[in-house]
Amino acid sequence: MVEEVQKHSVHTLVFRSLKRTHDMFVADNGKPVPLDEESHKRKMAIKLRNEYGPVLHMPTSKENLKEKGPQNAPDSYPHKQYPANQGQDVEYLVTGTHPYPPGPGVALTADTKIQRMPSESAAQSLAVALPSQTRVDANRTAPAGSEYRHPGASDRSQPTAMNSMIMETSNTKNSALMAKKAPTMPKPQWHPPWKLYRVISGHLGWVRCIAVEPGNQWFVTGSADRTIKIWDLASGKLKLSLTGHISTVRGVIVSTRSPYLFSCGEDKQVKCWDLEYNKVIRHYHGHLSAVYGLDLHPTIDVLVTCSRDSTARIWDVRTKASVHTLSGHTNAVATVRCQAAEPQIITGSHDTTIRLWDLVAGKTRVTLTNHKKSVRAVVLHPLHYTFASGSPDNIKQWKFPDGGFIQNLSGHNAIINTLAVNTDGVLVSGADNGTMHLWDWRTGYNFQRVHAAVQPGSLDSESGIFACAFDRSESRLLTAEADKTIKVYREDETATEETHPVSWKPEIIKRKRF
């Protein structure tokens, strides 16, 4: 016969379970865990050994030293030994130095060099041997290196050598605590101002790019009139015109390793010109939109281009093969630069980011997101392991290899199209409103501002600098402008520090804005 189980509500079952649990544990509910005497003794002995181990074995008396043998030097001052625990409150006396001197200048003697690991019995005896609280408080106020004695004991002065050592140590500490001189802001290096030397006309459209050849004999420009022109650097006369692009030429560069000129344009084409025959010998196909810039690797035969299709491409110069497609930017890539050291490729984009790339893997190493607006220009310092980027909000300086932020160069409130720097530390920024600012690279001091007049035949609104470059001697600065001209600037040879002083006021607390 099956016994019928009485059904209860969930509420009743829960409370029954709670009651059973309460009845099971109510005997010791809320009581502390019972203390295990044996483990407590071991714990205290270990704690005393660890915390007071260095002072457990004090210098021994004369008699004990004599028993140990003649190799231990006798102590001229008697010491007391800690007795075993006899159940009475005994005050103990420390009259000599211990293995770890209480302060600087306390010399080690033969007996203080004796160090042994404390035993458990010694650790237990230390519980009674520790000084009283009154003595501890008195010891805290006593100077380092002094001795502690019972009242009425004969005074013994410190040795003269010890006193001198203590005084020297205290003087050293005081000198370390002296107020240091406030750091001074570095003063900008004086640079002579640059003045307009020559205006070269010949293009029929905006001059968008410029490059100087390695021999410093001529330079090349690309224009919106779809031509590439080669000019004599000394006289400014036109030497050669190259036609082949069917849209604006946006980038030109001359190889230092071969007699080749590379160009790119808004017609998606990248061309390699042989300057011995003045003909195109290679095309590099792959970009899906306008190509905005290009650069050559300084040590290997590699060409890097950047495009409006949000990618940068790495090409083998000789085989025309696309080695890598650097994808990751979310908007047009406006500028690209190469260097021999890592990271070997740097790109700036309209998506406001700068990317440092691993050339071998074809992947991003670092992405810099500090800019708030499009990054249209990047320049690498020829000597320092640093670079600068230009954007309408700021010019920013960075450190390689990981893109550490250095400083902002504020004041050029326009769309910055181009940057150039020379070995003297002169940074040039050119903007779309025709203004050119010159900066001291180290301090960020803006020592000159130039706004050249628009040349006849152009509208006043056609006042913009699209590209700039120093020649190889760094004595001339070339700018490619929207008034269809190339302007050549030179340093003012008559300027001195007296005629053009550095008008610089350091900011006491320079605000570090990212």
Curated annotation (Swiss-Prot):
List every stretch annotated Disordered: 56-76, 140-159
* Stored InterPro entries: G-protein_beta_WD-40_rep, Prp46/PLRG1-like, WD40/YVTN_repeat-like_dom_sf, WD40_repeat_CS, WD40_repeat_dom_sf, WD40_rpt
Give compartment(s): Nucleus; Nucleus speckle
Record-stated family:
Belongs to the WD repeat PRL1/PRL2 family.
Functional summary from the UniProt entry: Involved in pre-mRNA splicing as component of the spliceosome. Component of the PRP19-CDC5L complex that forms an integral part of the spliceosome and is required for activating pre-mRNA splicing. As a component of the minor spliceosome, involved in the splicing of U12-type introns in pre-mRNAs.
Q: What is this protein's gene name?
A: Plrg1
Modification N-acetylmethionine occurs at: 1
Q: Which residue positions does Phosphoserine occur at? A: 119, 201, 391
> Can you say what this protein is called?
Pleiotropic regulator 1
Example of a GO biological process term: mRNA splicing, via spliceosome
Organism of this sequence: Rattus norvegicus
Q: WD repeats located where?
A: 202-241, 244-283, 286-325, 328-367, 370-410, 411-449, 460-499
Its keywords, alphabetically, are: Acetylation, mRNA processing, mRNA splicing, Nucleus, Phosphoprotein, Repeat, Spliceosome, WD repeat
The keyword Repeat appears for this protein:
yes
One Pfam family name is WD40
